[in-house]
């Protein structure tokens, strides 16, 4: 396969496929999304507990459906009929808590992974006695410019939002009067109500702003990032989109980015009294360098929940603050000899008398139930499996709903435990189930897929009974039947350390055990991640298998789904055991009669790119070629929250950082290497690629490199993805 062009290879494969009545896959089919399953977008359960809404495909309507029947009830919003509507389509929407108003987002502009600005509109849904909307005039939320994270008050009469790092309040009963709550917000200095870059990226949220249950207070987190070091990257005129203002001289984007060991933002929780206009700062006993990853008002307006972590992230505290006296009381503490996983925050849900929590205190992630006084009532789940998500508690019958991998680390199922402790599995098929429950907990929409089943969407009641099938993707199955598509199969093997690892393998369609095939290994390998899952997908790896490669993915030590001991065994020295496991995978594959052991390659993106470099320089010359896309190369270059969670600081763990650096073992790099990076990567900075490339140059190591102008960590836009995957394909065709 060496030095063969894609065009020639596809011609040969097409001739073979045509003889069988099937077409060969084309790279454009993959990058264009031709085989992307049909899905339901923009689904929101309505406050009444009986209905849900969804956007239509072109973003012009919001349609109401019955959870019980799946039948369309009515169109509750249409851009063509809403009076004084000055936009043609919209991007997203939300309901007021009472279900009487819509907040509609248009002209959405992404900022980072979760954050964006948008122009929002308010639309009334109130009906008269005849069920007719009494006022269908749509109004702008604000004329002062795009907004971030707008949130309704519980009674639906107010909306708070952030603009330019300051918080604003709009009172809907007073002609949408707008007032500014904070005045000190300033770019790269002070942020109110939204997280800074590292909080957003690593704690996974974009709003730090909450109303109290009695509509009298707004609580928010204030970030002072003035002492956080800045990072800048160049911005060029580029293409797709073109920035004409930079056609002669490039610009620069600067933002605050705390690298491992450097200062974080100073954080505090404040409350604003809407009536008296008084702002108070909570007296929170937080370490000077501690984190506040979430705040949330409970059902009691006098109890503001504040979640904190110490900088090592091995101690989690939940405080209840009195928003007026500012006093804080510790309600719960959870500690780990390693670190507390970030999925804990959104699985804490508050009810009038109770709250939920996920903890790994017994070695596996399980659901715990507490009184609002902070006393443990019971451990709801138990066993050598992981609870993935707490879905909710039915206050009427005392039942708990959650997803877990009890069946297999590769699968996710939906379960119910009633108040007597009886457990019932609700999901009917083995694979990956992702449910969305109604507000009443009586119904749920389930999205299911498995290795051989693309997205299947059903409506179910809370006993698991299927009420209606919404999406089958039969049309996609019919389309795929005309193509020669390689299929995944699971396998396991045991390493020389006696560790059992899970993997999947895709063989070429016309696989023959009497032949020897080149192998391309794909992996991510990051802490807590999983790539080996019983879920459906067609990707670039599928395309490579169609070209005659055996494609393999193995989740090594440090990945998720198998309990704390397996996942956290890499603590303080990430990258070392993971690389050894990828090398052992290659050695295991090389012993198979159908594998050409001299033609094994590896690739990955982000942490997977880092693992490519670590594996190719592990000291065992088993890889002939590898591609590292957007790879961190030295953890001193990466952010505080992610890096220190697993490694602590460079000062505390100097030897661990040295062993975990791709620089340390670069002299042992073996095989043909392609480095790929976006120059506008705000997450894994281009610095990682540039410095590692210089290291290879000085070591006399030859390598290939592909740089993408103005592209971030995702490396997309215009023709970029097509170019990227063509580059990767050609590299492996010529070097493997």
Question: PLM features: what roles do these ranges have?
Answer:
Residues 27, 31-32, 75-86, 179-201, ...:
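Surface-exposed loop and turn segments in beta-propeller and other repeat-based domains
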Residues 40-44, 50-62, 91, 103-105, ...:
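Non-catalytic accessory segments flanking enzyme active sites
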Residues 53-59, 66, 95-97, 103-114, ...:
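Beta-strand C-termini and the immediately following turn/loop, strongest in propeller blades
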Residues 70-71, 107-112, 116-119, 181-209, ...:
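Predominantly five- to eight-bladed beta-propeller fold
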Residues 71-109, 137-146, 335-338, 384:
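Blade-loop segments of beta-propeller domains
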Residues 114-168, 174-208:
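Asp-box/WD-like beta-propeller blade repeats and closely related beta-sheet repeat scaffolds
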Residues 221-377:
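Beta-propeller domains
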Residues 301, 433-736:
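Serine-hydrolase catalytic core recognition
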């Amino acid at each position: 396969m060496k030095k063969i062009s894609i065009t020639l290879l596809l011609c040969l494969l097409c001739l073979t496929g045509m003889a069988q009545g099937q077409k060969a896959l084309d790279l454009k089919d993959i990058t264009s999304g031709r085989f992307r399953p049909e899905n339901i977008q923009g689904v929101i359960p309505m406050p009444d507990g009986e209905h849900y809404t969804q956007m239509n495909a072109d973003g012009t309507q919001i349609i109401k459906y019955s959870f019980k029947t799946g039948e369309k009830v009515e169109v509750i919003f249409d851009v063509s009929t809403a009076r004084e509507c000055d936009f043609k389509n919209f991007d997203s929407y939300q309901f007021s808590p009472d279900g009487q108003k819509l907040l509609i987002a248009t002209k959405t502009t992404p900022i980072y992974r979760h954050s964006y600005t948008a122009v929002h509109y308010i639309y009334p849904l109130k009906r008269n006695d005849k069920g007719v909307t009494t006022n269908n005039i749509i109004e702008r939320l604000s004329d002062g410019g795009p907004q971030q994270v707008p949130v309704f008050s519980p009674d639906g009469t107010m909306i708070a939002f952030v603009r330019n790092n300051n918080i604003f309040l709009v009172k809907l009963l007073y002609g949408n009067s707008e007032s500014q709550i904070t005045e000190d917000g300033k770019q790269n200095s002070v942020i109110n109500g939204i997280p800074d870059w590292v909080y957003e990226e690593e704690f996974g949220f974009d709003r730090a702003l909450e109303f109290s249950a009695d509509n009298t207070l707004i609580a928010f987190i204030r970030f002072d990032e003035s002492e956080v070091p800045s990072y800048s990257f160049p911005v060029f005129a580029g293409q797709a989109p073109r920035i004409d203002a930079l056609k002669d001289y490039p610009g620069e984007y600067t933002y605050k980015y705390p690298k491992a060991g450097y200062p974080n933002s100073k954080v505090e929780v404040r409350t604003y009294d809407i009536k008296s206009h008084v702002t108070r700062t909570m007296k929170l006993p937080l370490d000077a360098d501690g984190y506040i990853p979430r705040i949330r008002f409970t059902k009691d307006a006098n109890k503001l929940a504040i979640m904190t972590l110490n900088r090592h992230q091995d101690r989690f505290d939940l405080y209840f603050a009195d928003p007026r006296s500012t006093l804080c009381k510790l309600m719960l503490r959870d500690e780990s000899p390693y670190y507390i996983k970030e999925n804990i925050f959104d699985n804490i849900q508050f009810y009038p008398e109770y709250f939920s929590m996920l903890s790994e205190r017994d070695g596996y992630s399980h659901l715990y139930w507490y009184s609002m006084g902070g006393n443990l009532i019971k451990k709801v789940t138990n066993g050598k499996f992981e609870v993935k998500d707490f879905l909710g508690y039915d206050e009427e019958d005392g039942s708990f709903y959650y997803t877990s991998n009890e069946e297999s680390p590769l699968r996710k199922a939906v379960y119910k435990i009633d108040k007597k402790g009886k457990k019932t599995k609700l999901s009917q098929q083995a694979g990956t189930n992702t449910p969305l429950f109604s507000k009443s907990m009586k119904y749920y929409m389930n999205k299911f897929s498995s290795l051989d089943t693309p997205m299947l969407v059903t409506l179910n009641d809370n006993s698991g009974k299927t009420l209606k099938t919404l999406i089958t993707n039969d049309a996609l199955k019919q389309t795929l039947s005309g193509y020669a598509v390689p299929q995944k199969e699971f396998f396991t093997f045991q390493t020389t350390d006696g560790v059992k690892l899970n993997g999947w393998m895709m063989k070429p369609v016309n696989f023959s055990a009497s032949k020897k095939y080149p192998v391309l290994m794909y992996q991510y390998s990051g802490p807590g991640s999983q790539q080996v899952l019983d879920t459906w997908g067609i990707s670039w790896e599928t395309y490579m298998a169609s070209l005659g490669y055996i494609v393999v993915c193995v989740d090594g030590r440090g990945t998720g789904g198998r309990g704390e001991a397996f996942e956290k065994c890499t603590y303080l020295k990430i990258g070392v055991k993971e690389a050894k496991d990828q090398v052992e995978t290659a050695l295991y594959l090389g012993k198979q009669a159908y594998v050409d052991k001299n033609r094994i390659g590896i690739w990955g993106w982000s942490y997977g790119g880092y693992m490519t470099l670590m594996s190719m320089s592990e000291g065992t010359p088993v890889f002939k070629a590898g591609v590292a896309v957007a790879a961190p190369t030295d953890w001193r270059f990466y952010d505080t929250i992610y890096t220190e969670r697993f490694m602590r600081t460079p000062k505390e763990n100097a030897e661990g950082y040295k062993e975990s650096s791709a620089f340390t073992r670069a002299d042992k790099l073996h095989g043909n290497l392609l480095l790929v990076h976006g120059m506008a990567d705000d997450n894994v900075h281009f610095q990682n690629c540039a410095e590692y490339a210089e290291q290879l140059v000085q070591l006399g190591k030859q390598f290939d490199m592909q740089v993408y102008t103005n592209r971030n960590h995702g490396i997309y836009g215009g023709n970029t993805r097509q170019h990227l995957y063509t580059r990767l394909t050609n590299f492996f065709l010529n070097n493997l």
